[in-house]
Amino acid sequence: MLSATATPDVISDVKQAIGLDNVTVVSDQFDRPNLKFEVHEKSKESAKEIISILSSGESGLVYCSTKRECEETSALLEAAGISSQAYHAEISKTVKESLQQQWSLGTIKILCCTSAFGMAINKPNVRVVFFHSLPASLEELFQGWGRAGRDGQPAFCYLYFSYSDRIFHIRNISDQANYDAEARTTAVKRFQKVMEFVLISSCRRIFLLSYFNPQEANLTSCNNCDICELRPFTSIPQSVDFTVKVQQIVDSIQQVVDKPFTIKYLAQVVSGKNNKKIKENGHDTLPAFGILKCTTKKCELFLMYILTKDILREVSPPRGSANSSFLQVSLGSQYMQYVTGQTKLMYQSL
């Protein structure tokens, strides 16, 4: 078996599945020091930033979640004078082969593609790989980024995302008819790791190495990611024990099971917003009301971090139901660990 992104847990599962205990595992290093990692929340300036980066004329890939995103992104690049084409599952085999060849030869500089592209492709001089939205897993991210800089020369790996990308992935997991409960939970937890990756305030390379091969995660910093690059100019956030706050949030969620919250609404509650809707619903009397003295945006990021620990979990309401376009907050599989105090939640000071 060959894999570029097998975690220790996956390797253990494979060994168990094939029923062989005496298996030799040969692994190369995961760390690719020539790759620089950057993660950015999308803003009004993101399109200009992406165009500026890709206008160098170097070979690159832009990974997108959907056919529409591929086509719209490619059109945006073409309009800016950048040689680009869209590549996705719905184009014919003949066209796919033609696009692969043109991109490999350098006739096309940028392919805007879904994960349908990339298998068995080995182009050494790819200088930049973008993810234009959140991937479904760190495996998908690392596989895509890993196509950059295979010649050993410096290359750049970017993830541009919106927090609303969560809706696409959670709904997609919910809609998978061939998933049983275990497969659905596994998919959710893999996506939670992606969310944790974008939310961290520590070295991104160390985080990825800790996930894929902990034996390599013995760095203090990599000096080649956006976090480490800013470290000399920013103070290291102090970690604070938020376990009691988490317990109050869980208590509040348990009290409103008949009318689930969204993360945005819950952020308003915990930040103490005294608006009409919160008052009418009586949510200004919940244990979590006003427990965090910071902006609603910071509260929302804190709640998203709680999601990555599976204390809370976002679920997709049935299609066609009221508010079916929003994700609802429910309790995750780990909430009791924090309610009983067996596990503490440490988070940067707000």
Where are these regions (language model features)?
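Helicase motor core with emphasis on the C-terminal RecA-like subdomain
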Residues: M1-A181, K189, A217-N218
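Accessory DNA-binding and partner-docking regions appended to nucleic-acid-acting proteins
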Residues: T186-A187, A217-L350
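Short linear capping/connector segments at secondary-structure termini
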Residues: D31-P33, S174, Y211-N213, R231, ...
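C-terminal or mid-to-C-terminal helical accessory/interaction module adjacent to the motor/catalytic core
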Residues: A155-C157, D165-N223, P232, I236
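Short helix-to-turn junction characteristic of helix-turn-helix DNA-binding domains
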Residues: W103, V198, I253-V257
